[in-house]
UniProtKB/Swiss-Prot annotation:
Protein name: Protein SHMOOSE
Tissues with expression: Detected in cerebrospinal fluid (at protein level).
Pro residues bias spans: 46-58
Superkingdom of the source species: Eukaryota
Additional notes on this entry: Shows elevated expression in Alzheimer disease patient brains and protects against cell death in vitro in neuronal cells stressed with oligomerized amyloid-beta protein 42. Intracerebroventricular administration to the rat brain for 24 hours results in significant alterations to the hypothalamus transcriptome and, to a lesser extent, the hippocampus transcriptome.
Quaternary state and interactors: Interacts with IMMT/mitofilin.
Magnesium listed as a keyword: no
Effect seen on changing D47N: Risk factor for Alzheimer disease; protein does not protect against cell death in vitro in neuronal cells stressed with oligomerized amyloid-beta protein 42
Cellular component, GO annotation: mitochondrion; nucleus
Alphabetic keyword roster: Mitochondrion, Nucleus
Length: 58
């Protein structure tokens, strides 16, 4: 495996901000998950359609 690809993969796993890459199990699986995407799904904004949400993937 080329070293640049290894670095990219290790950075993906360290960053933990790519739940689509890591798999669907990261989406709000447990309330104490420490990534922003899980936080967004576990603490939805009641005014979501009318106000911007800090974790909305846009």
């Amino acid at each position: 495996m080329p070293p640049c690809l290894t670095t990219w993969l290790s950075q993906l796993l360290k960053d933990n901000s790519y739940p689509l890459v890591l798999g669907p199990k990261n989406f709000g699986a447990t309330p104490n998950k420490s990534n922003n995407h899980a936080h967004y799904y576990n603490h939805p904004n009641p005014d979501f359609p009318n106000s911007p949400h800090p974790y909305h993937p846009r």
